[in-house]
Amino acid sequence: QRQMCIRDRDKVDRALLARVRAKLAAIDADSISMSQESIAESMMDRRQWFNPFPRVRYTERPDAATASIMEGSIIVLVDNSPAAMILPTRFFDFVQETNDFYFPPLVGSYLRILRVVVFLLTLFITPVWYLLVQDPDLPNSALSFLAVTSEYEVPILAQLLLTEFIVDLLKLASLNTPSVFSNSFSMIGALVLGDFAVQAHWLVPEVLAYMAFVAIANFAQPSYELGYAFKLLRLVLLVSSAALGWVGLALGTLLIIVLLVTTRPIAGGHYMLSLIHISEPTRHAQIS
């Protein structure tokens, strides 16, 4: 298996480049034909199977790869794969998208801020709503519009968890459906299942509304891997909130913060360090 590193020799961190080369040289595999994630896993110093946060970015866009090189990043190309690996990768790299830079600065900043807000909403909206509806005084408070007014036989927590799994089921079914029917299948399947579940008192309309928002919001962020990381952490927050109430939500949030600050990128450094900056155009890139 062959790999190729592309970098700007005037901007790249030499120590970083040496680490990446050493990690690539240490990989002992006959072939990697299905995914670059196998290379990424082999390059990790510590394999944290319990940590869902992605530590590598992938792109198939030449402009995104070139912009990363200009910022001092390293691009790794692998045989049999159309995507390029971008190293190092920090958390805030997932907040921006290549298309943001094709808009005026004000619009691009607005889109990045909106993406951060969506990140937080998808993570906390269902656990916080669940805790609020468990409050018996909610119907008499200023937040009474959040209360569940329909009759239901399935506990709210079970409804939220069930809907999470149904959304993933529809995604998987759509992927395995011929492209001609995939969009229609997803839409009709969601409508039929949702209507039947409400009429059978399995789900309340409020649960469907919040989960529909979460499902749509997941497509507002550019990283598929980070979307599923937030999904798994949202499930952790739901379970901890159901078990310990607001204390469980606080403990779950603390766990997420600990995971973020202890995550180490493949090429070293800090995961939460923001590397977003504007660079001057580079003169050339060296290929080795």
Q: Language-model segments: what does each one mean?
A:
Residues P205-V207, M211-S279, R283-S288:
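Hydrophobic alpha-helical transmembrane segments of membrane transport and translocation systems
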Residues A26, G72, G108, G189, ...:
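Residue-identity detector for glycine
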Residues I39, A84, F185, A212, ...:
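Positions that flank functional sites
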Residues Q1-Q3, R7-Q159, G268-G269, L273-L275, ...:
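Cytosolic regulatory modules rich in charged/polar residues
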Residues R90-L237:
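Transmembrane alpha-helical segments that form the functional core of multipass membrane systems
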